[in-house]
Amino acid sequence: MTRLVNNPDNFPSQAVAGLVSAFPNHLRPVFGGVVRAARTDRKVALVVGGGSGHYPAFAGWVGPGFADGAVCGNIFSSPSASQAYAVCKAADRGAGLLIGFGNYAGDVLHFGQAAERLRSEGIDARCLLVTDDIASAPDHLKRRGIAGDLPVFKVTAAACEEGRDIDEVVAIFDRVNDRTRSLGVAFAGCTLPGADEPLFRVEAGQMGVGMGIHGEPGIHDETLGTADEVAACLLYTSD
């Protein structure tokens, strides 16, 4: 595969810089990520984040009607607590701050540390964990967050934009997350910038059912079916 990259180590930061350059009226760069270029004071702020490589998430989700800021880690790696703190401080609008992310150990640790630091400064900061991946655990609240991030964060952001208070927004997040389920199938692994081999491989004619977005093991491999058969697998697998 042919790729156009500079130094692979700089890929995430250059991707963010390019996005900001393309949309300077909407995005402002800060340490660790981006925030909205225009401020709306006295509203609950929503900051989303996670590892880079899931484009357009997470920086591409910042703007009117969506997130107030995004924390962008290295490729498939959790942002640091200091990055999360810096973006959250820049995004805070004085009415409480919500930090939304998929349920992954590194994100839980680092975003949690940032929230603790913000609370010590008098900011009502709370973490929102998306848990939609039915392949990852039997208990809904222990599952990973995958494609469900998008609808869950969008509805949550709309509640923030309406001027709901932080308790109302959290209640809406809980309802939407509780009603969101995802299941993925993989046909091939991606090749990360600077790597020579794919992150994982799936045998020709097979599909990996339930594989995670970073190549985490799924439920099983099975024969690749037709579009209708794959759709039925995704829609009717029990959670």
Q: For the regions a protein language model found, what residue spans apply to each?
A:
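N-terminal amphipathic/basic leader segments beginning at the initiator methionine
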Residues: 1-46
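Glycine-rich oxoanion-binding loops at beta->alpha junctions
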Residues: 54, 61-93
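Gly/Ser/Thr-rich loops at beta-strand to alpha-helix junctions
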Residues: 51-56, 102-110, 145-149
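Internal, active-site/partner-interface "lid" segment
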Residues: 136-143, 153-214
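Gly-rich Lys/Arg/Thr-decorated short loops/hinges at beta-loop-alpha junctions or inter-strand turns
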Residues: 42-49, 58-71, 136, 207-223
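Short, acidic/small-residue loops that bind anionic groups at enzyme active sites
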Residues: 70-75, 119-142
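Conserved small/polar residues in nucleotide/adenosyl-binding loops
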Residues: 236-239
